[in-house]
Amino acid sequence: MPPVEDLENPNYKFATEVFSEDGKVLGTYSYSKENRVFVGYNDLSPNIINALIATEDVRFAEHSGIDAYALTRAVVKRGILMQKNAGGGSTITQQLSKQLYSPSADNVMERLFQKPIEWVIAVKLERYYTKEEILTMYLNKFDFLNNAVGIKTAAFTYFGCEPKDLKIEEAATLVGMCKNPSLYNPVRYNERSRGRRNVVLDQMRKAGYITEAERDSLQALPLKLKYNRVDHKEGLATYFREYLRGVLTAKKPDKANYRGWQMQKYYEDSLDWENNPLFGWCEKNTKKDGTKYNLYTDGLKIYTTLDSRMQQYAEDAVTEHLKELQGYFFKEKKGAKKAPYTFRLTQEQVDEILGRAMRLSDRYRIMKKAGATEAEIKKAFDTPEEMSVFSWEGEKDTIMTPMDSIRYYKFFLRAGFMSMDPRSGHVKAYVGGPNYHYFQYDMAMVGRRQVGSTIKPFLYTLAMENGFSPCDEVRHVEYTLIDENGKPWTPRNANKKLIGDMVTVKWGLANSDNWITAYLMSKLNPYNLKRLIHTFGVRNRDIVPSVSLCLGPCEISVGEMVSAYTAFPNKGIRVAPLFVTRIEDNDGNVLATFAPEMQEVISVSSAYKMLVMLRAVVNEGTGGRVRRLGVKADMGGKTGTTNYNADGWFMGFTPSLVSGCWVGGEDRDIHFDTMLHGQGASMALPIWTKYMVKVLGDKSLGYDENETFQLPEGYDPCKDDVNLEGDTHIEAVSYTHLRAHETELHL
């Protein structure tokens, strides 16, 4: 018998809900058997209440926990007359007491002993709670299968609606499951469930809740479901929800728990633990009883900055373009022995990469833990078996070896995309890859890749901060610098326009010209460039301050790049990504609110100059494809492509949105062999464009295609113009001198 305290405060486990900024439920966090979301009595449809009472306990309003008439009838018909369809004698309150306090019985005798205890509990529940509260508790507690625990989750899972919107026939279907959810599972047994639904409708007619005509018309209807599988790998914003889960449940970093190669992560986690109130929120905050919040059982409400419409547009853009791009990639690699890897690798190198992937797989770890030898594991990986695999035409069944499946998945190109408001920091869309179910590594905030020419705006910003202007002229010729090892470094240049002529700095950035970039690097300090990149919010400590840094060999995440670019349309103020605005408890009490983090990283003057140059990238330079694909808005941007087309980037912004996209293979040696499809303007830019066309076309979002950047009246970016023509050969930079002036960076 449970103590009085437990009866007065039954222990419910409620799932945490994640909401979009526009009020849509993105998903839940729960244990597999406790995906329950609380709903109050006033938010229940009268149809579900009427169906439940008519079917399970028609005298619910009259008894005090035990229905003597129903109990006597059941005993006589079943115990004496041996009738199988005698009807149940348990009231709704008794059934609730069983759900709350009776474990599953192993045999008939054990179940018989449980019954009297349930009667006593039922009477006490009636004493402590109103009838409405008992009905609410019952419907919140019941397990409707398919990971749909509680009426709110069930209504969404089976009919795609809220409990208050359940139609009569839908409510009857769910109540019909209460007799035996497995037997009357509408997903598996549609006709059987329909028959049970019709029994419930007949009971509702007998109880006077519906007329005979209503019953007949409703019974004639087919059982139609709008089935929504409740799975954290399915639905909208899957990568974002998983990222957010990790942030909310993070523990205080302990260096002993990080391996040597994880020191960068330890560094970032330590910074976040001290400075980010959302990081480890469940660990840092406690409830009234002193215990820490549990993301999976405390029924929290997480209100995020994502807009469900913009998120859908972003996911659609990634899907549409990757599907098309993948066809070109398959065609290029068809017949190549080392595919999907580049021909530049030896077969031994390819085998080593695939072998490493095998050793990192779950199958390998499980077999190794079970004591299998390397030979046994190798044999298992080379044995064909039936499996379902991803394809852009939908999941397909096939037969292949696990080793072949590893190589098969390596063929698929990956992507990362993020979009945010440069003024508020609100992240509006977040896509970490092509399909979370199959490709779970997050390339939006977690993964880092070389950024190529998208780093150039940072160098040009450093130049503006040091007295350059967009109109300064430089001779367009090859420049040679001396690197940190004392060796000459001359960057290659794809741009063959105006060779030998005087060109402006603005022209250099618009055309992503490596020679003009090298010239600026020769006049500046690679250590200062590294420092500026960190100031823009990039936290990778492994950035090497070499002269080649100006071409983007360093690895940065999409999220870091998007945040960094907010400074350009935002008058020099960088805004950190904001993912959550507030957290509430199950009763709607606000537990925490979150505000954007802002930092002035460059002067307003430099921001204006960069804005002018980045607009030229789109209107006059390498980003011109944006215009041809239909985006007419006032905007700036930058393309990026790394060596051998391993990474394709596009960063773009309007006055109200900054968005960035990366596309590439899982491994750097998986890439297009030609620039036709391998450059950033072909791999990443179309995703950005598809997204923006959809966003600007949806007037309900409030983004105006005619919005323009606000520059001072009569602004002239060339007013500080001076002629800085220099030599075509730059003498060695004194690295000893530079290191002496480098200071430790504190983020």
Q: What do the PLM-derived regions correspond to, one by one?
A:
Residues 182-467, 471-487, 493-494, 506, ...:
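Extended, non-catalytic substrate-recognition/exosite surfaces adjacent to catalytic cores, especially
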Residues 93-95, 173, 418-419, 428-430, ...:
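Structural recognition of the beta-strand scaffold that forms the well-ordered cores
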Residues 23, 52, 96, 134, ...:
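Residue-level preference for non-acidic, small/hydrophobic
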Residues 1-12:
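Aromatic-capped interface at the extracytoplasmic side
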Residues 12-15, 19-217, 222-270, 282, ...:
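Peptidoglycan glycan-strand catalytic modules in the bacterial/periplasmic cell-wall system
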Residues 737, 742-747:
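Single conserved hydrophobic/aromatic residue that forms the stacking wall/gate
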Residues 340-351, 355, 423, 482, ...:
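Soluble, non-transmembrane domains of envelope/secretory-pathway proteins that act on or interact
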